[in-house]
């Protein structure tokens, strides 16, 4: 489900920081946040895919270039010692002021005035992105019900089992 990754990207461009998004997710019950997960998987994998799909991206679609800038700086995540977080001194990663500066510079370049986003709002936006995309998948007939989406989110994406799934939370099962 790429929708919640995109929403997380929008939030860091709009005013949140990666560790704030990740903390909102882990406090909710995810085993790790989206940015820590990207660092674990390797930022270069998604970067290669984004480059392949660039020509097909709608011109009017918002595109956040921050992850691309990290990759251009050879920050591929844990495998390179730096990504969204700095792993050079701590295997679990620490917030890196270089990433914060890069985020702020990219937002400024695009004319975005960053404003802090509260953790409650971060979580709401992440869940709404999951729910909207999940409903679209059901509407297109790709999945038979919201319950199927929840099973995938719990077993494949680490959604906290005891929460029931994003579709369950929205009453869409």
Language-model region placement:
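N-terminal glycine-rich phosphate-binding loop for ADP-containing cofactors
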Residues: 1-173
């Amino acid at each position: 489900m790429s929708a919640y990754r995109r929403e997380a990207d929008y939030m860091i461009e709009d005013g949140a920081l990666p560790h704030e998004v990740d903390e909102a997710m882990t406090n909710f019950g995810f085993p790790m946040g989206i940015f820590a997960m990207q660092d674990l998987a390797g930022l270069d994998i998604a970067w290669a895919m984004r480059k392949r799909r660039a020509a097909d991206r709608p011109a009017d679609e918002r595109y956040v270039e921050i992850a691309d800038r990290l990759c251009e700086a050879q920050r591929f995540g844990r495998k390179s010692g730096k990504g969204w977080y700095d792993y050079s001194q701590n295997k679990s990663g620490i917030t890196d002021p270089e990433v914060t500066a890069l985020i702020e510079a990219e937002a400024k370049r695009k004319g975005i005035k960053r404003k802090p986003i509260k953790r409650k709002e971060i979580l709401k936006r992440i869940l709404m992105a999951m729910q909207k995309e999940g409903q679209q998948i059901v509407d297109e007939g790709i999945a038979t019900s919201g319950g199927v989406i929840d099973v995938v989110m719990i077993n494949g994406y680490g959604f906290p089992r005891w929460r029931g799934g994003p579709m369950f939370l929205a009453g869409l099962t």
